[in-house]
């Protein structure tokens, strides 16, 4: 029964379908990173568990202008602790360091990064321990991005 478990007020009760869209676990800080889709768009950190075993206090994650129109998914690179921020409307994946500064980006536009056509509605992103990036998109599309292997010759 859900009533047996604590609830968490994440705020933005009036956001409708523009509330929290993305969620990622940050093992280094033992916190959840949450992404608010838009109006206003935002990134937040929620320590979990807090000192008393409950969720801590949600804090805004400091970042500059992301250059994105929305946030559709988040992932944390376990190797670096960097955040991967996916925007379906901007057709972009942005890497932020732990201070919120952009490190790199991956355009999801057709004609770039091996894509014949752009990824129109990217909805989810994750990364494995080797740095391969996996993106799911509507309708039922799956993409894998891997760094090119050096030529052995």
Q: Model features per residue range: what roles?
A:
Residues 1-153:
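Sequence/structural signature of beta-propeller domains
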């Amino acid at each position: 029964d859900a009533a047996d478990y604590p609830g968490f007020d994440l705020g933005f009760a009036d956001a409708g379908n523009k509330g929290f869209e993305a969620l990622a676990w940050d093992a280094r800080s033992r916190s959840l990173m949450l992404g608010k889709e838009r109006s206003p768009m935002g990134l937040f950190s929620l320590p979990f568990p807090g000192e008393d075993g409950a969720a801590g206090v949600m804090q805004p994650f400091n970042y500059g202008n992301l250059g994105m129109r929305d946030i559709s998914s988040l992932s944390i690179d376990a190797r670096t602790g960097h955040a991967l921020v996916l925007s379906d409307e901007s057709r972009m994946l942005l890497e932020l360091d732990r201070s919120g500064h952009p490190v790199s980006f991956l355009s999801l536009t057709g004609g770039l990064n091996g894509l014949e056509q752009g990824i129109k509605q990217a909805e989810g992103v994750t990364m494995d321990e080797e740095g391969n990036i996996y993106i799911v998109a509507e309708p039922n599309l799956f993409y894998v991005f891997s760094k090119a292997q050096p030529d052995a010759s």
